[in-house]
Regions:
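Intrinsically disordered, low-complexity segments enriched in polar/charged small residues
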Residues: 7-8, 65
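Bacterial extracytoplasmic/cell-wall-associated proteins, especially those involved in peptidoglycan
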Residues: 20-108
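Hydrophobic h-region of N-terminal signal peptides that target proteins for export
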Residues: 8-18
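Positively charged n-region of N-terminal signal peptides that target proteins for export
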Residues: 1-4
Length: 108
């Protein structure tokens, strides 16, 4: 697990500059879902909180042999998705915290 977290942290760090120039409209579905989950669950908790949600998604996906999308959208896993669609939450990708969340999401 330590190896996964270290690898995840290194990858996230490497892509920070990329996230600052990335356009949200060109994100693939999985990146959008993971980034939205991170934002909905922890955008007020700073980068450490958002990173923790991303690490949680990555760990669950690894342990359960599921995709990050499956982990995020599984019923009762992340309350932000209960009764909601991507369209309902996509506005979160326009928040100031979105750049970092996208960076983390691309590395989950």
């Amino acid at each position: 697990m330590r190896k996964i977290i270290i690898t995840f942290a290194a990858a996230a760090y490497a892509f920070v500059s990329y996230a600052h120039t990335h356009k949200n409209h060109s994100l693939d579905r999985q990146t959008k879902i993971v980034a939205i989950t991170i934002l909905a669950e922890a955008r007020g908790e700073g980068e450490a909180g958002m990173y923790a949600v991303g690490a949680c998604i990555a760990q669950r996906a690894f342990e359960r042999k599921q995709t990050p999308t499956e982990v995020c959208l599984k019923k009762w896993q992340f309350s932000c998705w209960n009764g909601k669609s991507i369209k309902d939450l996509e506005h979160l990708l326009k928040t100031p915290q979105a750049k970092y969340a996208i960076t983390v999401a691309k590395n989950v």
